[in-house]
Amino acid sequence: MARVRDGIAELLGAAPEEIIYTSGASESNNLALKGIVQASRHVGKHIISTALEHSSVGGALSALQQQGCEVDLVDIRRDGTIDLEHLRELLRKDTVLVAICAVDSELGTVQPIQEIADILRDYPNCRLHVDATQAVGKTKLVLSGVDTMSIAPHKFYGLLVKKKDLVIEPQIHGGGSTTPYRSGTPALGMAMSIEKALRLALENQNERIAHVAALNRLLRAELAKYPKVRFNSPENAVPHILNLSVNGVKGTAFQQELGKNDVCVSVKSACSVEGTPSKAVYAVSRDRKNALSSWRISLSHLTTEAEIAEFLQIFDRCYRELAQ
């Protein structure tokens, strides 16, 4: 177990004692947010986050609000990144936590984590939590200035990377055999799987990202020929995620029609409430109808040009049937 933890830490550029095993990203997010805030209750109860976060972050923040915490959401710019000036305006002496996702799961937006960390240097009592679940293998992980980072590879098990000098309140109590912050004996097989999954995700990363980026550009160029198509993902998003809307057609309709042709696309994030618009798309576009029409294409380094060509043929048939 020690060798595996050393291997994971080396891959992430962290110290072995900074690695905490959890059941998944939801637990990692809850442990980080609740653990930080509860350990900082003597400093303050003010938290800053965004409307783009995973439901495990939103749920944890709601629970903390019920315990008397105050939560402010930083504005989102049109390109999907947070408004850094608004973040500066929201920060207070009693702000104890800023919680930001590294990569948005619906749009693929890459948040400026290093710039956020630099801003927080002037607030030594404020901790930065980063949900990096969507970032591993898609972009460079930034650990400098980050106090806690959630990872789920993907999604059979979880990790929380916690800065070694940071004290948080545990949420699961017991013997604390491997760490005082999370009781419960980790499963060796799952821990070994994390190391292997991380190694596979990070090997040849630059070449793989370049391959996916080329496919993304091809998709954008071809889909842009359809007058009712609107891209929601910014140009500088991770290329693995392409979110779009077809004006006047609900995303669920396209999802069902494409599904009949064995094409799988996503409508919102997996943990969203059914029947509601994508909160990420709405946060960027401020357009409820557009958000309801949105859906996401996912690409990987295993996707081929032939598969893109086949998808475009199927999309063309679906577009003619649903949008005209």
PLM features: residue spans?
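Pyridoxal 5′-phosphate
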Residues: 1-324
